[in-house]
């Protein structure tokens, strides 16, 4: 099995671990920078049981496939496409967080507060939910980077379904808070998630 863990496997796994570590640490640091360390909990790391299970399954797929079909992981063009997706997704998400500033939270606000503003400039001018768009691209990109066909499809379907349920729920409150301003914004701006209006 050690002959299967050549340069490509080491590179792909290192990129995956660095992508995951950077994603979570940068989210945590941004939450502290924007909201102050008194408003930060371990939930700010965005690691849930379902997320940990998904990542574990993706690594399991990787190791099974590299053992049974080592050539399957040698598609550099596919792997590098995934790496580009990870970088693009990460960039879109972080631009969303920085642009929204104190209006950005990881939890859906159900009650308005003075710091919550309707953000329609920057990346929000083009994408209504850029943090979700970025996460979808990032998460699917991690699996393409590993040349994991099963996890690529599973991550795409599961993350898409999560946002299909979350976006209408979140937008219910945004319409309550911002009224016709949000209606007009939603009408002219794409959600950023395929097939979700």
Region roles according to the model:
Residues 120-121, 125-133:
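Histidine-centered phosphotransfer motif of kinases
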């Amino acid at each position: 099995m050690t002959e299967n863990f050549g340069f490509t496997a080491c590179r792909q796994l290192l990129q995956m671990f660095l992508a995951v570590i950077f994603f979570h640490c940068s989210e945590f640091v941004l939450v502290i920078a924007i909201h102050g360390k008194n408003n930060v909990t371990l939930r700010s790391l965005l690691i849930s049981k379902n997320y940990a299970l998904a990542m574990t399954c993706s690594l399991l797929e990787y190791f099974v496939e590299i053992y049974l079909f080592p050539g399957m992981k040698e598609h550099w063009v596919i792997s590098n496409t995934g790496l580009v997706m990870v970088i693009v997704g990460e960039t879109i998400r972080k631009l969303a967080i920085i642009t929204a500033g104190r209006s950005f939270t990881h939890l859906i606000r159900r009650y308005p507060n003075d710091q919550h503003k309707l953000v329609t400039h920057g990346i929000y001018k083009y994408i209504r939910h850029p943090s979700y768009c970025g996460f979808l691209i990032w998460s699917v990109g991690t699996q393409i980077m590993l040349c994991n066909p099963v996890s690529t499809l599973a991550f795409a379907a599961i993350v898409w379904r999560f946002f299909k349920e979350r976006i209408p729920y979140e937008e219910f409150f945004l319409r309550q808070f911002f009224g016709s301003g949000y209606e007009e914004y939603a009408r002219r701006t794409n959600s950023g998630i395929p097939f979700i209006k």
